[in-house]
Design a protein with these regions (language model features):
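Catalytic donor nucleotide-activated moiety binding site of glycosyltransferases and closely related
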Residues: 1-8, 20-68
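A donor-sugar binding/catalytic signature common to diverse glycosyltransferases
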Residues: 71-118
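A structural signal for well-ordered alpha-helical segments within the folded catalytic domains
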Residues: 23-26, 69, 86, 90, ...
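N-terminal core-binding DNA-recognition domain of tyrosine site-specific recombinases/integrases
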Residues: 13-21
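Surface-exposed alpha-helical segments enriched in charged/polar residues
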Residues: 26-30, 34, 73-76, 172, ...
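Leloir-type glycosyltransferase catalytic cores
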Residues: 115-190
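Short low-complexity, flexible loop/linker segments enriched in glycine and/or proline
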Residues: 54-58, 114-119
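Short glycine/proline-rich turn/loop motifs
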Residues: 1-13, 148-155
């Protein structure tokens, strides 16, 4: 959405394989809220909305007060970033904030920058056999460095988004990691 809006003279369809609907995060947002976190959806342009009516959730990306500066500010002050591997995910990393990426694609992306936190990646399905590929099969078929929707079509595979349940389970893991880090820091200072 961001690229299509600001750089209109070029087609960005080749990035479509990275997209996923915001509705897939609804269970996870509710989980974070149940755990007393405030959840702020960032981004200057976004598609879709979550139907969540809770004072601990703010869809800043669809608000009238959004700005690129405020995106940077919010991500510099957040406790963690949890979301997709679009360009904005690099901001919390640059502020040394924990960041947990979902629907990461291509697989190579989870190794592309120094990472201290886990990520989950999209599964890849062989359209000919209808089989989900193993990591070894992805490597053997050179799918770890596939960067366009057209390349995936040529290789006769599709990317499958992480399910709502997989994303929620990853969120549980993320909070466990943060809690362990906090406990370790507290133990050092006691």
């Amino acid at each position: 959405t961001y690229l299509n809006n600001f750089l209109r003279d070029k087609s960005w369809e080749y990035h479509d394989y990275r997209n996923f609907p915001i509705k897939d995060l609804k269970k996870t947002v509710n989980y974070f809220i149940e755990k007393n976190y405030f959840v702020i959806r960032v981004g200057s342009l976004s598609e879709g909305k979550l139907n969540i009516s809770n004072n601990r959730y703010f869809d800043y990306s669809n608000s009238d007060i959004k700005s690129d500066f405020m995106d940077c500010f919010l991500l510099s002050k957040c406790e963690m970033f949890f979301g997709g591997s679009s360009g904005i995910c690099l901001l919390p990393a640059s502020f040394r904030k924990p960041y947990f990426l979902i629907n990461n694609c291509p697989l190579e992306g989870i190794f592309s920058i120094k990472r201290n936190y886990p990520a989950i990646f999209k599964r890849i399905k062989n359209l000919k056999t209808n089989k989900i590929l193993s990591i070894k099969e992805m490597i053997d078929r050179d799918l770890c460095n596939t960067y366009t929707s057209e390349e995936y079509k040529i290789k006769n595979v599709i990317n499958l988004n992480n399910s709502e349940q997989e994303i929620k389970e990853f969120a549980i893991e993320a909070l466990n990691i943060l809690e362990c880090q906090k406990k370790n820091r507290d133990d050092v200072y006691e």
